[in-house]
Design a protein with these regions (language model features):
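N-terminal hydrophobic/helix-forming segments and targeting peptides
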Residues: 1-116, 149-153
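Short acidic/His/Gly/Ser-rich catalytic and metal-binding motifs that mark active-site loops
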Residues: 117-124
Length: 157
């Protein structure tokens, strides 16, 4: 069956560019979060998680990435202890969006757990449900999506 509608014209609608851009930014953040939490751990690991966030710099998000050496220097033993269960090196990603352009305003802070796959150590977690441990990074995915939404819509926060 051939489509019978070839064009559509909306009459009387106000300019929707402004509201659309805001909603597009929010939808982009939600989509980013969904994509991150859907990736399997052989695709999404600490380094690739950081790589998938680097494009936020183009939206004006400041990215700070800590590697193993920097975390050790800062005394982040608990995080490094968890990371020892993987052949992949650890990463910690911090993101900053300053929509006010001022440094004297107290920030709003989001913290999200970003363990890309948590086995809990050798034999500490039962095998049943182990595949669900990829969602231990859902908090960091949500924060990454929120930063995308804030920066893409140029939020004043």
């Amino acid at each position: 069956q051939k489509p019978s509608l070839t064009s559509l014209v909306l009459v009387g609608a106000a300019d929707a560019a402004g509201p659309y851009a805001r909603l597009e930014a929010i939808a982009g953040g939600v989509a980013r979060t969904r994509t991150l939490v859907s990736e399997p751990p052989n695709i999404l690991y600490p380094e690739s998680f950081v790589d998938k966030a680097l494009d936020l710099a183009g939206l004006g998000v400041e990215l700070i990435v800590l590697d193993d050496a920097e975390m050790k220097r800062l005394g982040m033993g608990a995080l490094l202890g968890v990371a020892q269960g993987s052949v992949r090196p650890a990463r910690l990603l911090a993101m900053r969006w300053n929509g006010t352009g001022r440094d004297d305003v107290k920030p709003v802070v989001f913290v999200g757990k970003g363990v890309t796959f948590d086995t809990g150590g050798i034999s500490l977690k039962p095998a049943a449900g182990m595949e669900d441990m990829k969602w231990d990074m859902g908090g960091s995915a949500a924060v990454t999506g929120a930063m995308h939404a804030l920066a893409a819509r140029k939020a004043k926060a």
